[in-house]
């Protein structure tokens, strides 16, 4: 059971997890854990499932997925009958009015839909994940000199579950450098898995780029792959002018994570998100929603 904070009704909700029985079995049973290490965490497994999700045959999953998880298709640019395959549906674009972006340059917005955690006064040797698991920022970035620039800064971890909108966006005007790709495995990023596999973010396939934002300084913008995420697709054009709310890229099928790192004294995160993070609870947000402000 995954409990998260709903800031709209100021109460806790229970997340409806896609493939919950499979996740619990895989990460809780000896046989499941053996399969995970031998097969499921490998790129080959995610490529096989990704291949299926790109085929027309996978269309039969779409309507059941929509009904099971109550996905509001009135927000989508296309309706279910127009998608060519499950991945086409999964990476769907939303109508612009579905995710309005406030122009106020002082407002910090969420880069995507999902559940967010925030950590300030970043300790480079120990960043806390869901369920209290720690990992090293140095190991995550694999660049010690760059990591040191973010000492005592702020970290935002946005977890996208399979039922979420899976495109991620820029949070400010600016210019983004080329993407750096780091090889890794494909463990799930669901809290069920995070509690069983230490330092998942450091072990999984991930990509990051430096975003030179106009109002929040230089931001490390990282995407982390997960089980069945065959691809992290970057759609932005590096080293060109970017506007707040522009699409940066998207994940193909699976749960995934976006992580942002800010330098010291550049942003202030909303109190409800910070307080819930301290308690160990994620907060649900949508792309474009204000989550903080410029210092």
Curated annotation (Swiss-Prot):
InterPro entries associated with the record: PS_Dcarbxylase, PSD-B, PSD_type2_pro
Primary location group: membrane
Pathway(s) served: Phospholipid metabolism; phosphatidylethanolamine biosynthesis; phosphatidylethanolamine from CDP-diacylglycerol: step 2/2
Gene Ontology molecular function: phosphatidylserine decarboxylase activity
TM segment ranges: none
Cofactor: pyruvate
Post-translation changes: Is synthesized initially as an inactive proenzyme. Formation of the active enzyme involves a self-maturation process in which the active site pyruvoyl group is generated from an internal serine residue via an autocatalytic post-translational modification. Two non-identical subunits are generated from the proenzyme in this reaction, and the pyruvate is formed at the N-terminus of the alpha chain, which is derived from the carboxyl end of the proenzyme.
Gene Ontology annotations of biological process type: phosphatidylethanolamine biosynthetic process
Family of this protein: Belongs to the phosphatidylserine decarboxylase family. PSD-B subfamily. Prokaryotic type II sub-subfamily.
HAMAP family on file: PS_decarb_PSD_B_type2 (MF_00663)
Protein's recorded name: Phosphatidylserine decarboxylase proenzyme
Lineage, broadest ranks: Bacteria, Bacillati, Bacillota, Clostridia, Eubacteriales
